[in-house]
Amino acid sequence: MRDDEKYQRRHLWMRTWKGERGLNGELLNDFVCIVEGEIVGRISEQETGPMRGTYKWDGGHSRRIRVNVLPQGGYAPDVHEAARKVEEHYDLLRQEAGLPPVVGVRVKD
């Protein structure tokens, strides 16, 4: 996939644990999605096991939104698709809760 075809994240993403290293000695590919100062999702690369090389995504972390949208998590083939899943899940949560969409919150990496 070319860079211009990859999903363009709309929200702030940060490493879950800055400086933490994985089994291979490289920085962990583990990130949280932050919207309006709140962690709303997480993605992490699967280093071992049958899903090795994929990214696990989890949504539904908002403490302010009290509705559930399923599925709340799953696996994606790459980091861009996993980020898309988390951001779209958060959009659905806001919609189900009757809240307006979040726009214009993307900040530089």
Positions of the model-derived regions?
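Short beta-strand micro-motifs enriched in acidic
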Residues: 46-50
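Negatively charged, low-complexity tracts enriched in Asp/Glu with abundant Ser/Thr
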Residues: 1-38, 66, 104-106
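A short beta-strand signature
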Residues: 30-33, 55-61
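Intrinsically disordered, low-complexity charged/polar segments
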Residues: 95-109
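A short, charged, amphipathic alpha-helix used as a generic interaction element across diverse proteins
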Residues: 76-97
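A short, exposed loop/beta-hairpin motif centered on an aromatic-Gly-Thr core
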Residues: 60-81
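A short, polar/proline- and glycine-enriched secondary-structure boundary/capping micro-motif
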Residues: 52-56, 68
